[in-house]
């Protein structure tokens, strides 16, 4: 009842075309065993490896049982011994039930040792030779037969004990391996023997392999100032841990007058008590060779004897790593060398090996002598001051080397000019020169200044270059002197400053946009352009906060919460009583300014474009649209703005660069794409005329032309004064 398996096993088959019984180990119907049948296990049952369980070769990977065993090996035809006890290690690999027997190496045994039985599955002794050893056949204090040899297992390791206990094997108490009687007798004889030739080994291979390329480094000094023409010599001592040798190098200062030697002391063992004198060959050796030998051949002498009593041997002590420490004075062939400091590796070595924690260094350098200031003759007046100085340094005059790094860093490239431009007026008592306007340019690459006067018609002045590009000295300095003159620096230029340029006094009234932005970005060099410092200065006038709000409110008649720049500057200057400069007022105004439209309205641009197209009688818009359709491969009716600009230039569209760029930016979408049909339809002045608008022509002029005959332009138009009052005084509306 309840059976679901009824198949019958195949018991008969063919082997080499011969009918024979092949199902001795197969069960009967439904997997049940036949009467009297016992299935012989092929492998250990731990683990079973059925279903989702891990197989044995995965679960027991790299897990080995280790047993200690011995074997009584009979020794025939020998009177000294009848048998010999041979020890073995039996390894049972759990992953595949293989066994390996290994015999440990015994010195001077005369037996072939090592692997006694290679790793494989070993069958049980007869009559069960058709089965193999499994983990359940091993235990302590039992006999195991491998190929007719009986191994007596007397112990195992801790892992084997724990494993056998976990799988349910009851371990027997461990036994002891009997001592080999012959080895015992031989050991007793060796202990009482005194060899004629001493067996002393001087093995330095371990030290070499452990400390190769590891060197202790000490910084030391040899004070030889007591001798004639002697002085303090700085040295570096290298102690090689691989062979206990010492090497010393000398650190020669610049222009010391001494010959540059590669080594102060060649690498060798350094004796403690030196110089010890001159010894004969063979006196300082590890072993003494007696003057007897058994013969010689063409290659070597053989049959020599060593003196085991070491009579007459000279012992010489050498410096070791334990003798070296900071503050110790060592003897280097009669020279007293003081160890002053060491490197980090040396400190770690002594801290790890000897537990030393005190590594206080000793100053090894002598106090530097007072520096003699070199005096140069005064400036002669010929050439520049740098050229005169270079002619005094050496016999062969060399040109002055400019600061090339600064030149590369601040040279103009692209749209970045690295030039600070200020607009100034001449401070003079002459009425004709009061209204003259100048442009002062400061070049950051070489700290030079140029002054330009814009050309104004009917002014009586030719204009043009007022001062060519040159470095400008500060006034009040002596001309013929040995020191370099001081020149005007960029930090001294700001709006509201007075600059003396070769006797002409200029008042800086304004600066261009690039200069103001540069000064605000580098507020550490230009503190007057730092909004934080200016706000902090305004907070000191907190007592005038109410008055300041009343003045701004009175100036804002339309209640727009903003005032123009001239009104703002006048209010700030009057209330702070001259504590703020024009540069600081501009910094505040630029921070709280009302944003302006970056470009004119699109209709204004289209009207100006129509005016230029009419003057040039350009009407070829259909051809432009056809070219755009040809370029539009995907038929989306949009093209990138750069492609439309290229087509306009190839068709000679009579619009200047600035106006065309502004038109394209006004028609492009967020992806920089332009609908070319709507763009050229808007430019078609025949089909879509636009009324003429009275606006200023959208042409970017040079700053010199824009300033010609005009007062100083304002940096911003309107300022939000309420935002300023909130940030400075916390005043609400």
Curated annotation (Swiss-Prot):
Tissue: Expressed in trachea multiciliated cells.
Task of the protein: Microtubule inner protein (MIP) part of the dynein-decorated doublet microtubules (DMTs) in cilia axoneme, which is required for motile cilia beating.
Name this polypeptide is given: EF-hand domain-containing family member C2
UniProt keyword annotations, A-Z: Cell projection, Cilium, Coiled coil, Cytoplasm, Cytoskeleton, Flagellum, Repeat
Localization in the cell: Cytoplasm, Cytoskeleton, Cilium axoneme; Cytoplasm, Cytoskeleton, Flagellum axoneme
Gene designation: EFHC2
Gene3D superfamilies, A to Z: 2.30.29.170
TM spans (from-to): none
Keyword Coiled coil in annotation: yes
SUPFAM superfamilies (alphabetical): EF-hand (SSF47473)
The organism of origin for this protein: Bos taurus
Stored Pfam families: DM10_dom
GO biological process, one term: regulation of neuron projection development
Domain DM10, residue spans: 61-168, 212-354, 416-523
Binding partners and assembly: Microtubule inner protein component of sperm flagellar doublet microtubules.
Lineage: Eukaryota, Metazoa, Chordata, Craniata, Vertebrata
GO cellular component: axonemal A tubule inner sheath; axonemal microtubule; sperm flagellum
């Amino acid at each position: 009842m309840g059976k679901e398996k009824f198949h019958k096993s195949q018991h008969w088959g063919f082997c080499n075309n011969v009918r024979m019984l092949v199902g001795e180990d197969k069960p009967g119907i439904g997997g049940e065993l036949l009467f009297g049948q016992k299935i012989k296990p092929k492998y250990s049952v731990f683990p079973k490896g059925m279903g989702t369980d891990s197989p044995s070769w995965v679960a027991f990977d790299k897990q080995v049982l280790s047993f200690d065993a011995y074997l009584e090996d009979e020794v025939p035809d020998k009177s000294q011994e009848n048998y010999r006890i041979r020890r073995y290690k039996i390894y049972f690999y759990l992953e595949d039930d293989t066994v390996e027997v290994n015999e440990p190496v015994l010195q001077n045994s005369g037996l072939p040792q090592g692997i006694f039985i290679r790793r494989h599955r070993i069958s049980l002794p007869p009559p069960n030779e058709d089965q193999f050893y499994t983990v359940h056949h091993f235990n302590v204090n039992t006999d195991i037969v491998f190929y007719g040899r009986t191994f007596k297992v007397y112990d195992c390791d801790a892992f084997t004990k724990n494993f056998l206990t976990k799988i349910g094997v009851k371990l027997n108490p461990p036994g002891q391996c009997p001592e080999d009687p012959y080895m015992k007798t031989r050991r007793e004889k060796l202990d009482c023997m005194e060899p004629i030739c001493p067996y002393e080994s001087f093995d330095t291979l371990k030290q070499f392999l452990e400390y190769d390329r590891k060197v202790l480094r000490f910084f030391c000094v040899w004070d030889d100032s007591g001798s004639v023409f002697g002085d303090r010599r700085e040295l570096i001592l290298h102690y090689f841990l691989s062979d206990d040798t010492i090497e010393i190098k000398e650190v020669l200062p610049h222009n010391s007058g001494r010959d540059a030697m590669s080594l102060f002391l060649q690498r060798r063992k350094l004796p403690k008590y030196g110089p010890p004198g001159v010894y004969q060959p063979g006196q300082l050796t590890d072993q003494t060779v007696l003057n007897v030998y058994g013969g010689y051949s063409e290659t070597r002498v053989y049959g020599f004897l060593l003196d085991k009593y070491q009579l007459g041997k000279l012992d010489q002590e050498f410096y070791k790593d334990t003798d070296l420490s900071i503050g110790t004075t060592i003897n280097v062939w009669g020279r007293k060398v003081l160890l002053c400091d060491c490197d980090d590796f040396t400190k770690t070595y002594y801290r790890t090996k000897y537990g030393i924690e005190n590594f206080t260094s000793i100053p090894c350098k002598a106090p530097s002598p007072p520096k003699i200031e070199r005096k140069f003759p005064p400036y002669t007046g010929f050439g520049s001051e740098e050229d005169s100085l270079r002619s005094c340094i050496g016999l062969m005059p060399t040109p002055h080397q400019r600061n090339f790094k600064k030149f590369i860093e601040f040279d103009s490239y692209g749209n970045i000019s690295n030039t600070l431009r200020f607009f100034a007026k001449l401070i003079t008592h002459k009425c004709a020169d009061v209204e003259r306007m100048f442009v002062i340019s400061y070049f950051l690459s070489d700290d030079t200044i140029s002054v330009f006067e814009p050309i104004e018609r009917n002014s009586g002045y030719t204009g043009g270059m007022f001062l060519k590009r040159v470095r400008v000295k500060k006034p009040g300095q002596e001309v013929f002197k040995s020191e370099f003159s001081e020149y005007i620096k960029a930090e001294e230029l700001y709006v509201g400053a007075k600059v003396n340029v070769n006797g002409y006094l200029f008042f800086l009234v304004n600066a261009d946009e690039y200069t103001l932005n540069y000064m605000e970005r580098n507020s550490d060099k230009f503190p007057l352009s730092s909004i934080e410092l200016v706000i902090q200065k305004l907070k000191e006038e907190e007592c005038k906060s109410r008055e300041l709000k009343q003045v701004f409110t009175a100036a804002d008649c339309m209640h727009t919460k903003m005032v123009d720049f001239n009104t703002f500057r006048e209010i700030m200057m009057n209330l702070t009583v001259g504590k703020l400069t024009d540069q600081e007022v501009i910094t505040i105004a630029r921070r709280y300014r009302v944003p302006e439209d970056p470009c004119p309205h699109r209709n204004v641009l289209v009207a100006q474009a129509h005016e230029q197209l009419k003057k040039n009688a350009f009407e070829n818009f259909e051809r432009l649209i056809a070219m755009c359709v040809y370029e539009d491969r995907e038929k989306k009716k949009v093209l990138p703005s750069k492609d439309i600009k290229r087509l306009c230039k190839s068709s000679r569209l009579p619009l200047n660069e600035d106006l065309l760029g502004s038109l394209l930016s006004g028609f492009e979408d967020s992806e920089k794409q332009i609908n070319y049909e709507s763009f050229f339809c808007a430019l078609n002045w025949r089909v879509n005329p636009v009324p003429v608008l009275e606006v200023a022509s959208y042409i970017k002029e040079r700053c010199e032309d824009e300033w010609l005959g005009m007062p100083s332009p304002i940096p911003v138009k309107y300022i939000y004064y309420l935002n300023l009052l909130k940030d400075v005084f916390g005043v609400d509306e």
